[in-house]
Amino acid sequence: MPPKIYVIHENSEWVVPLRSAFAELNLPFEEWYLDQGVLVYSTPPPLGVFYNRMSASSHTRGHRFAPEYTSTVLAWLDSHGRRVVNNSRALQLEVNKVAQYAALRTFGIRTPRTFAAVGADNVIQAASHFSGEFITKHNRAGKGLGVRRFRSQT
């Protein structure tokens, strides 16, 4: 029998096609719904393959700390040498636009002029560096949530 596949997520909608595919292929799997939990670090994780489907937009579904908890679980899996698809690095990129842009640039992919600003006053200050239209996007959102277009700084 193949090793069990553990699907790490916090959004059941995203797992529907996986459930069907795994059932069709007769692959054993288990879902780890990580919107919250307790990790006993001294206990080794089960053997298997871990597929990380955690999303930066989890907070939009009421799961504010799911990425942080998933990061903890991934570190635990890594410390035991478990195979993880979409590992800690993937999660880091998921929750950090600057890290995403840096990774894209290492492959020669251009990214827009970017300022990282935290706090309302700092966002306004960063906006003053643009002479025309600009777009804001926060680190944690999917489906275009939080994207705003401004025609000017005022």
Language-model-derived ranges and their functions:
Residues 1-6:
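Extreme N-terminal starter segment of soluble prokaryotic enzymes
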Residues 79-81, 88-154:
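Active-site nucleotide/adenylate-binding loops and adjacent lid/helix of ATP-dependent enzymes
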Residues 7-10, 151:
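Small/polar loops that bind or transfer phosphate-bearing groups
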Residues 10-113:
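Conserved N-proximal alpha/beta basic substrate-recognition cap immediately N-terminal to
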